[in-house]
Design a protein with these regions (language model features):
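Carbohydrate-interacting/catalytic domains
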Residues: 1-157, 162, 179, 491, ...
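Conserved, mostly hydrophobic/aromatic
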Residues: 24, 71, 159, 201, ...
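Short, flexible loop/turn elements at secondary-structure junctions
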Residues: 28, 50-52, 62-64, 75, ...
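Core domains of carbohydrate- and sulfate-ester-processing enzymes
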Residues: 73-140, 211-225, 279-306, 419, ...
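Short catalytic/ligand-binding loop motif for oxyanion handling, primarily in non-cytosolic enzymes
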Residues: 78-82, 165-167, 207-211, 271-274, ...
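Hydrophobic faces of well-ordered beta-strands that scaffold small-molecule active sites
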Residues: 155-157, 199, 263-265, 340, ...
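Substrate-binding/active-site clefts of carbohydrate-active enzymes
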Residues: 160-336, 344-367, 387, 432
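Conserved alpha/beta catalytic core and glycan-binding cleft of carbohydrate-active enzymes
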Residues: 357-522, 527, 535-539, 570-577, ...
Length: 702
């Protein structure tokens, strides 16, 4: 077979219409073989003829899309010094843009001899490893444009491609559980009904089903076990796995964009599926273990583990950083995605041992003209020391606000001494973000996410019920800040069911009407349950799949209406923090942009906030006090609102503010009823009864 020198850049397999350039980085390689596989699995080995700056490369004319390939890296095998080359192991290209097949767990996948890890395993792993695929980069995007939705107009919907669509009978059978199914008209209609402007997809990079799960008859459902940072997982494709998955993913993005919906990817750049020192050799470990992974200093056979998965990517190494940045740029420029949610993002900031917001990774993102312009969302923690970094990411980043989740849960389950922090969380968490010149939209607000209870389970279970995971119910978070409303799990008690429904409305209304960016877990709007399992990482079955035949239509309708209320009124989605403080203003001064009231109509004092037993408060939002301006520089104004929160177990009479705040009000939302309230008039200083554990919203009409 004819081989030309080719080029060291770009890395990976790049088809140009006449042939394909192959390039692979390895500082430790002594020789690199490109291995081509035909449809029968027959292997043809070709030495890459050139090496330039530790990048091995060659060009093969007439090799095109659909060609399956892998690499064999010849080099030193000395685990004690962190060297793990073994040419008997076929290796996936870290830059593979498509991957065909699944890991077939076999002893040959492990580079070491099971009797002595210092000896290499000489069995050939090629028959048991998936193959990289050369892809056709050309796609008809038509008039596709990124929606470019501002954060303060964004509503995020966290979704699992398969779990959301697999049981939806409005989607053709062959498309359920796939990229094509996610952008089916029935799904787009559902998103639009909820006011969703961005879907945040749980991991769609090619991932591996863990060996331990396979032995227990389970599968990796969530997908946080990546092996290909450029390849959309082929299991979510209805059209094929020899490159068709790339085209299908692009089609999904194009269709969602046409509907005005952005696509955000949950990405896992902190570790790979190769695990710890006892794990398999699938890709980077056999290519250049020292460059790609953080090794224990002085004990290089072992891996630093800040992720709880066995290894940590070495973001201190320039080629590992390049891999991550190249992957991010590829997904933006070639796949047209609109942003990323970075799993365990604190790990990416660990240049040495501590989390450093000035790390090279953040510097590279900041100066990159492509990546810096999309939505960047951090999961601001990892499992290492000092890993909890909520509020500490650089200014252009937003963060999953775990403190919002915890505080809102505590408030609505009636925990004492939460009122002051609750007020801060629903106003954008200024204590976390204002000091670094960030805006309220730095806070991605959520009550539930994939990791933990669904909203229905949050109000139905006090304890986790993870027995189906096969770990003796030891896995998963034990401190859930949940309340079952009186009975653990499912019940036919109508009073308890009504209270649970009301609590769900409380959470949804609080989420959508808080300052910041709301994120809704898929199915929470429809009553999805996981039967009390709060760690469904391995449940690819009806425990996690959304049951479209039994939707809570009332809750869907309520969610849609509250989302519309947020959309229609910029006072609920300000771009700047409030200036008002919970103290009385002076005579003759204009109304503050926000004012807090006790149930008897007094402005809250410091003593009121410090009371450990307060569970109710009224909040005045001044529609004339919005400091934001529109694109033409015109001042934004809105109606004023009063929001009344009552987390007590009994009803409370609230006195509405004096006439200077508004002479006439209408109740537009009351979570004590399943439907959005019919406008009910109320004059200034009217006494309004707010039911136990409910939220009421009043709009000023005069």
């Amino acid at each position: 077979m004819q081989v030309w020198p080719g080029s060291s850049y770009p890395l990976g397999a790049t088809y140009d219409g006449m042939g394909t350039n192959f390039s692979l980085f390895s500082e430790v390689a002594q020789k690199v073989e490109l291995c081509l596989f035909d449809d029968s699995g027959r292997e043809t080995k070709i030495d890459l003829p050139e090496v330039d700056g530790f990048v091995w490369h060659g060009y093969l004319p007439n090799v095109g899309p659909g060609q399956r390939y892998g690499y064999r890296v010849h080099g030193p095998y000395d685990p004690g010094t962190g060297l793990r080359c073994n040419s008997r192991k076929l290796l996936l290209d870290p830059y593979a843009k498509a991957i065909d097949g699944k890991v077939d767990w076999h002893p040959s996948l492990f580079a070491y001899d099971f009797d002595s890890q210092d000896r290499p395993n000489d069995d050939d792993s090629a028959p048991f490893l998936p193959k990289a695929v050369v892809v056709n980069p050309y796609f008809n995007w038509g008039t596709d444009r990124a929606p470019g939705r501002p954060y303060n107009e964004t509503v995020i919907y966290e979704a699992h491609v398969k779990g959301l669509t697999f049981l939806n009978k409005d989607i053709p059978l062959e498309m359920r559980g796939t990229y094509a199914g996610l952008s089916h008209p029935s799904m787009i209609e559902h998103f639009q009904k909820l006011g969703v402007t961005a879907v945040e997809l749980m991991p769609v990079h090619q991932f591996v089903h863990d060996h331990g799960l396979r032995e227990r008859g389970l599968r990796n459902y969530w997908g946080y076990n990546t092996i290909g940072f450029f390849a959309p997982d082929a299991a979510y494709a209805s059209s094929g796995t020899a490159g068709q998955q790339v085209q299908e993913f692009k089609g999904m993005v194009r269709d969602l964009h046409e509907a005005g919906i952005e696509v955000i990817l949950d990405v896992v750049y902190n570790h790979t599926a190769e695990g710890n020192h006892l794990g398999p050799t699938l890709s980077m470990r056999g290519i250049d273990n020292q460059a790609y992974y953080r090794l224990v200093e002085g004990q290089a056979e072992y891996y630093m583990d800040y992720t709880g998965t066995g290894n940590t990517l070495n973001v201190r190494h320039p080629h590992t950083l390049q891999l991550i940045m190249d992957s991010l740029r590829y997904w933006v420029t070639e796949m047209h995605v609109d942003g990323f949610r970075f799993d365990l993002a604190s790990t990416l900031a660990r240049e040495f041992y501590d989390v450093d917001r000035l790390s090279a990774f953040f510097d590279l993102v900041q100066q990159d003209p492509t990546v810096s312009q999309v939505k960047l969302i951090a999961e601001p923690w990892d499992v290492g020391p000092g890993g909890y970094q909520v509020g500490n990411f650089p200014p252009q980043w937003t963060e999953w606000n775990g403190k919002y989740r915890d505080t809102v849960r505590d408030f609505w389950r009636g925990e004492p001494a939460t009122l002051g922090e609750f007020a801060g969380r629903i106003t954008g968490s200024p204590d976390l973000y204002e000091h670094s010149s960030r805006r309220p939209v730095a806070s991605i607000n959520f009550v539930t996410a994939h990791d933990g209870f669904t909203l229905r389970d949050l109000v139905s279970y006090n304890e986790k019920h993870n027995e189906a995971n096969g770990e003796g119910n030891r896995d998963g978070e034990s401190h859930n800040r949940s309340w079952n409303c009186g009975v653990e799990g499912e019940t036919e008690d109508l009073e308890i069911l009504e209270l649970r429904s009301q609590q769900r409305r409380n959470f949804i209304a609080t989420l959508f009407l808080s300052q910041g960016v709301p994120m809704l877990l898929h199915g929470d709007e429809a009553g999805r349950t996981q039967q009390g399992n709060n760690n469904c990482y391995c449940q690819d079955n009806d425990i996690t799949w959304m049951d479209w035949a039994n939707l809570d239509e009332d809750l869907i309708r309520f969610t849609s209406q509250v989302s519309q209320l947020r959309h229609d009124h910029p006072v609920f989605r300000r771009r700047r923090f409030f200036n008002g403080r919970p103290v009385r203003r002076g005579a003759g001064e204009p109304l503050s942009d926000i004012t807090w009231f006790t149930p008897d109509g007094r402005e809250m004092t410091e003593e009121d906030w410090e009371s450990g037993f307060g569970k109710s408060v009224a909040m005045f939002l001044n529609g004339d006090g919005i400091p934001d301006r529109n694109q033409r520089g015109e001042r934004i104004t809105d109606d004023s609102f009063v929001m009344i929160f009552n987390a007590h177990d009994g009803s409370i009479d609230f006195t509405l503010p004096a006439s200077e705040y508004g002479s006439k009000w209408e109740v537009v939302l009351d979570t004590a009823t399943p439907q959005l309230a019919e406008p009910a008039p109320a004059a200034a200083q009217t006494v309004l009864t707010v039911e136990a554990r409910s939220l009421a919203v009043l709009q000023r009409v005069a």
